[in-house]
Amino acid sequence: MRHIISVLLENESGALSRVAGLFSARSFNIESLSVAPSEDLTASRMTIVTSGNDAVIEQIVKQLDKLVDVIEVSEITSSDHIEREIVFVKIKDSDTENENLKSLKTNEFLKIHKAE
């Protein structure tokens, strides 16, 4: 089953590498990973999407909580949350392709930006 784990960690060099190393050493798979500064500039929020049964996820959470840079770990799959994904695609610019892209823009969640 797919699970989302939120990790608040100190904004220090090597913190991401320690988290990735934990997953690698225990053969856990990271399906998706996102890291950004939190509201406290000394900390970062890491969001990890992984899969496994409840016992595996419980083990991952316990192991993450033991890491030196980790402040807080929470499994948020069953909590209320908003999910979004982003994709960057580079395409050749032409009038025909621009018209095709405009026709794809079917709702406010799809935003197309033209690089200058």
Residue spans of the language-model regions?
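A conserved regulatory-domain signal marking ACT and ACT-like small-molecule sensing domains
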Residues: M1-E116
